[in-house]
A protein has these predicted regions:
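Short beta->alpha junction loops
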Residues: 40-50, 387-390
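Short alpha-helical segments enriched in small residues
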Residues: 119, 232-419
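Proline/glycine-rich low-complexity loops and linkers
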Residues: 50, 56, 60, 77-174
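Glycine-rich phosphate/diphosphate-binding loop of Rossmann-like nucleotide-binding domains
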Residues: 2-41, 234-235
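Conserved hydrophobic helix-helix packing surfaces used for dimerization/oligomerization
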Residues: 5-7, 149, 275
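Glycine-rich beta-strand-to-loop/alpha-helix junction loops that act as flexible
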Residues: 10-12, 67-75, 153, 226-227, ...
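Accessory alpha-helical/coil subdomains and C-terminal extensions
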Residues: 142-217, 222-224, 232-237
Length: 419
């Protein structure tokens, strides 16, 4: 089994800033969890000569080369051609791939496959084909001398599917061991704080990994183990997971979830509770994140984006004299918004957000980053006062995180940190 890897992303759009390379981060986590050390990330534009040169350099410093992008049917999709030229491997037509693509076009597009798509069925001779049920471009893995090359689509959801369902099982088969992993989610602590609490548990070993990485507003831990089978892997991870939960306490909010919003929806669904939201500075972000999850309609009744005082008054019935006395960005208005949307929708629970995401503060001396998050429940209304740093996007993202965290804490009988 390859022990070292280089990830090579192909696409001019990745270099001109038009597209963010999310595939590299995901693949690095997957390979690391599988026991493959990622040594380099390389990005190459849509130029065959430069890609061939990159392959020549990479094969001298890593055993596994993982390529993303450039597998489609257009003129600039030349990854297979350049990689096979550099590794002296011919391309051959794979008839089973042709049939897969024809069925996909008939099912999804209700038409015949265009002739130009036929080039996607040409793959390296002797390769293991990675079929693609979520797109048209197949991937593959093959070995040339001491180099193993894996070719994956560049479209993120296709790349992720193929990496998880094709590349990872292939690595396990080659190694003769099973790899299993869990992503643990933490909110309310910084990465250094997590490391301080878990210091002796963090490790990168041959058969066990527990490593932190941060995203805006939260910290995640990648826990993975290798063993003879899935049961053995889970048995190795169980005591570590239990210790992480014990040390982090209320800051640990879930494993293998998409985010705080999924945790909140699950908790509400289990308790038969409904939810609503009133948003000002987040501009509908809370509602979006909830409705991104299938089945959210069982819990989320609706939301109001009350960006102006007029809408706060007319729709949420926030008193005009309250706005005049306290200002739109205040604990009092956050309370009124949360209660107003709960009454309006008839929801069991409601959250509200009002704040200053920038670029300027308000005329009452509140600086950018001042945010109030309200939670209205049958027992009453609580408010969390935040002072957040960063740009407009970060402030909005963190504000939504805190709204979900207040809900999570309420639903699990933890202090909501209201004031």
């Amino acid at each position: 089994m390859p022990r070292t890897a280089e990830i090579i992303a192909v696409g001019s759009e990745l270099l001109d800033g038009g597209v963010t390379n999310t595939n590299a981060a995901f693949l690095s986590r997957l390979l690391t969890a599988a026991g493959v050390e990622v040594l380099y990330h390389t990005t190459v534009d849509d130029d065959a000569a430069r890609l061939e040169k990159a392959v020549t350099i990479a094969r001298g410093r890593a055993e596994l080369l993982v390529f993303t992008g450039g597998l489609g049917p257009t003129y600039d999709d030349m990854t297979k051609t350049a990689v096979c030229a550099a590794l002296d491997t011919p391309l051959v037509l794979h008839q089973e791939v042709v049939e897969d693509m024809r069925r996909y076009f008939e099912k999804v597009f209700r038409r015949e496959m265009p002739e130009c798509d036929m080039q996607q069925a040409y793959l390296p001779e002797g390769c293991t084909v990675f079929r693609n049920p979520v797109g048209t471009a197949p991937g593959c893995v093959f070995t040339a001398g001491k180099t193993t090359a894996a070719l994956l689509p560049g479209v993120p959801h296709e790349c992720r599917y193929m990496a998880e369902h094709c590349l990872l099982p292939w690595l396990e088969q080659v190694r003769g061991q099973t790899v299993r992993s869990h992503t643990l989610h933490i909110f309310g602590l910084t990465e250094p704080q997590v490391q301080e609490l878990l210091g002796d548990l963090l490790r990168r070993e041959a058969d066990m990994t527990l490593a932190p990485y941060a995203k805006p507003g939260e910290v995640m831990l990648q826990l993975s183990a290798r063993g003879a089978d899935e049961r053995a892997c889970e048995a190795r991870m169980a005591p570590v997971l239990a210790e992480v939960r014990a040390r982090l306490g209320a800051y640990f909010y879930g494993a293998d979830v998409s985010g705080l919003e999924e945790t909140v929806l699950t908790l509400c669904r289990e308790r038969g509770l409904t939810l609503a939201a009133a948003e000002s500075c987040t501009g509908g972000l809370i509602a979006k994140r909830l409705t991104d999850i299938p089945g959210a309609s069982q819990v989320f009744l609706g939301g109001v984006v009350s960006y102006t005082n007029h809408v706060k008054q007319q729709v949420l019935h926030v008193p005009e004299n309250l706005l005049a006395r306290c200002g739109a960005v205040s604990a009092e208005v956050a309370r009124a918004m949360a209660l107003g949307v709960r009454v309006l929708t008839g929801a069991d629970l409601a959250v509200s957000v009002t704040g200053l995401a920038g670029p300027d503060g308000d005329d009452r001396g509140n600086p950018v980053g001042t945010v109030f998050v309200g939670l209205s429940a049958p027992e009453g209304v609580t408010v969390r006062h935040l002072t957040l740093g960063g740009d407009r996007e970060r402030i909005r993202t963190l504000s939504a995180h805190h709204a979900f965290d207040m809900l999570r804490r309420y639903l699990t009988n933890l202090p909501t940190e209201g004031e």
